[in-house]
Amino acid sequence: MAASTLYKSCLLQPKSGSTTRRLNPSLVNPLTNPTRVSVLGKSRRDVFAKASIEMAESNSIPSVVVNSSKQHGPIIVIDNYDSFTYNLCQYMGELGCHFEVYRNDELTVEELKKKNPRGVLISPGPGTPQDSGISLQTVLELGPLVPLFGVCMGLQCIGEAFGGKIVRSPFGVMHGKSSMVHYDEKGEEGLFSGLSNPFIVGRYHSLVIEKDTFPSDELEVTAWTEDGLVMAARHRKYKHIQGVQFHPESIITTEGKTIVRNFIKIVEKKESEKLT
């Protein structure tokens, strides 16, 4: 049975490149902070199995009733053991979003589907996509069904799941560094709607999706640095599958909360389409 706790995290939490444990949430008054975070007891399972998009489409999860906020499924946050996960959660809580957090080895994708999520957020984390538990399988099986947002390693999971290669950045480690990022969403509403172009982001990574092997038949680049590194991408067919290489929850990313808000808007738009 899942244990439930309420949290309050610090937006200014520094990030360690070697972090392998997430922040311990402190209990707060549920009357002042109604956001609920569900945390399952740890049980490690080997659940990764590469699945096809066609299989995901033929085994869709139940539809979400959207006429009452209490009837929404949660946005599921897959925590890849990163110290910034709860800063992302803090943004979602401040935006009035109901969500649940599970570590990447605490449940299977089938168990995740049964929670009827309205969206999925794959958090940053140490290591490579192969260290991300159910994240890769989640991209392939739930991505076609509900909006999916990958952050940092979450974007790398999207890239690898659809055939890209994850390599060390040719420009070295970026740890707490700011960069100017340019974007082009081709006039469509997306993660960067309403942002300055370019805008400033905070970066904490040493790996990137390799430009030469970028799976352009499946994905399209939506944002990049001035030196040409991929900073965001989305699926060509399932445009609600998208991710960013930088950290929107970092204080360096001055317009980061707008990006999280835009993800929630994408979730709401997807729900409204189910009613038409």
From Swiss-Prot:
Question: Which Pfam families does the annotation name?
Answer: GATase (PF00117)
Give the catalysed reaction(s), semicolon-separated.
Answer: chorismate + L-glutamine = anthranilate + pyruvate + L-glutamate + H(+)
SUPFAM superfamilies referenced in this protein's UniProt entry, alphabetically: Class I glutamine amidotransferase-like
Q: Which domain of life is it from?
A: Eukaryota
What InterPro entries does the record tag this protein with? Anth_synth/Amidotransfase, Class_I_gatase-like, GATASE, TrpG/PapA_dom
The outcome of changing G150D is: In trp4-1; no visible phenotype under normal growth conditions
Tell me the function of this protein. Answer: Part of a heterotetrameric complex that catalyzes the two-step biosynthesis of anthranilate, an intermediate in the biosynthesis of L-tryptophan. In the first step, the glutamine-binding beta subunit of anthranilate synthase (AS) provides the glutamine amidotransferase activity which generates ammonia as a substrate that, along with chorismate, is used in the second step, catalyzed by the large alpha subunit of AS to produce anthranilate. Plays an important regulatory role in auxin production via the tryptophan-dependent biosynthetic pathway.
**Name recorded for this polypeptide:** Anthranilate synthase beta subunit 1, chloroplastic
UniProt-annotated catalytic positions? C152 (nucleophile), H247, E249
Please describe what happens when the gene is knocked out. Answer: No visible phenotype under normal growth conditions, but mutant plants are insensitive to inhibition of root elongation by ethylene.
Q: Which GO terms are recorded in the biological process aspect for this UniProt protein?
A: L-tryptophan biosynthetic process; regulation of auxin biosynthetic process
An MF annotation (GO) of this entry: anthranilate synthase activity
Q: In which tissues is it expressed?
A: Expressed in the central cylinder of mature primary root zones, including pericycle and early lateral root primordia, and vasculature of cotyledons.
What residues does the Glutamine amidotransferase type-1 domain cover? 74-273
Transit peptide, start-end: 1-50
**Swiss-Prot/TrEMBL keywords:** Amino-acid biosynthesis, Aromatic amino acid biosynthesis, Chloroplast, Glutamine amidotransferase, Lyase, Plastid, Transit peptide, Tryptophan biosynthesis
